[in-house]
Amino acid sequence: MSEPATTTPTPTPAGDHDAAATACKPAETTTALITCRSSSCSAQQQQQQQQQQEEPLGDDQLGELREIFRSFDRNGDGSLTQLELGSLLRSLGLKPSTDELDSLIQRADTNSNGLIEFSEFVALVAPELLYDRAPYSEDQIRRLFNIFDRDGNGFITAAELAHSMAKLGHALTVKELTGMIKEADTDGDGRISFQEFSRAITAAAFDNIFS
């Protein structure tokens, strides 16, 4: 893999570099979606989650969720099987074990038909989307993306990712680099688009918040 031509990166606030280094680390846990329903969650956290369940998601958030849902509803029947839900979560950088996936299905499947309809999917993830420590705004994600997209062509290559992570003090092994590209590159074209980057960053941020 050849090293990209050296260019002067666009100056960015130090916080953006810290956020990029943190958010771009591979996700390590999948307890994000179930932690605050467990008995170990504090009463204050549970009260916050209950209040947020009563708040509506914005149209943009619902649209994004519907797009994600449809992309994994392979037979277009308006519901996800356990296998499809597992694939969806893995595409977001989460790594559910079989037991964790079973727990999610049991919690979300309110009509007990063994499938997850869109309304059940929204009910599952809405509290995390509305949590007061929500992940980065689109503007913040765009700034992070621009740090890595060194040639400004709208895509992040493996070389750009490796170079930028090294400059941020997180040099990657070949295995780590390959793994990160594989996690984020959902369409398999060998590079990361802004949409893919946004999903990967959001998933990693949720994982850091709730782990």
Swiss-Prot record:
Residues 1-22, 40-60 are annotated as: Disordered. Signal peptide: none annotated. Residues 60-95, 96-131, 136-171, 172-207 form the EF-hand domain. GO terms for molecular function: calcium ion binding; enzyme regulator activity. PROSITE patterns: EF_HAND_1 (PS00018), EF_HAND_2 (PS50222). Residues 44-53 have a biased composition (Low complexity). One of its GO terms (cellular component) is cytoplasm. Ca(2+) 2 binds at residues 109, 111, 113, 120. Ca(2+) 4 binds at residues 185, 187, 189, 191, 196. CDD domains: EFh. It holds the Pfam family EF-hand_7. Ca(2+) 3 binds at residues 149, 151, 153, 160. InterPro entries: Ca-binding_regulatory, EF-hand-dom_pair, EF_Hand_1_Ca_BS, EF_hand_dom. Ca(2+) 1 binds at residues 73, 75, 77, 79, 84. Disulfide bonds: none annotated. Potential calcium sensor. PANTHER family: CALCIUM-BINDING PROTEIN 8-RELATED, EF-HAND DOMAIN-CONTAINING PROTEIN. This is Probable calcium-binding protein CML11.
